[in-house]
Amino acid sequence: MKEGIHPNYEVVAVTCSCGNKFETRSTLGNVLSIDVCNLCHPFYTGKQKVLDTGGRVQKFADRFGMFGAKK
């Protein structure tokens, strides 16, 4: 590698919104805040966060249900 053209690759303290803290290496700086990590992401935990889709579906049906009704 050429000297002086690459950013410094330093140890970074990463903090997740769930409270998990760990260290990795990055060129972004010395502190990094992230939204999800391997301890809180649904893919890794196997737990799905349930959204209020039932309420949304019902709201949609109330607003636009009359268009699909046959007479």
Curated annotation (Swiss-Prot):
Record: residues binding Zn(2+): 16, 18, 37, 40
GO molecular function: metal ion binding; rRNA binding; structural constituent of ribosome
Key words, A-Z: Metal-binding, Ribonucleoprotein, Ribosomal protein, RNA-binding, rRNA-binding, Zinc
Pfam entry (one): Ribosomal_L31
GO annotation, cellular component aspect: ribonucleoprotein complex; ribosome
Gene3D superfamilies found in the cross-reference section: Ribosomal protein L31
InterPro entries according to UniProt: Ribosomal_bL28/bL31-like_sf (IPR034704), Ribosomal_bL31 (IPR002150), Ribosomal_bL31_A (IPR027491), Ribosomal_bL31_sf (IPR042105)
The keyword Metal-binding is assigned to this record: yes
Function (record text): Binds the 23S rRNA.
Oligomer and partners: Part of the 50S ribosomal subunit.
Family: Belongs to the bacterial ribosomal protein bL31 family. Type A subfamily.
Name of the featured protein: Large ribosomal subunit protein bL31
Gene that this polypeptide is encoded by: rpmE
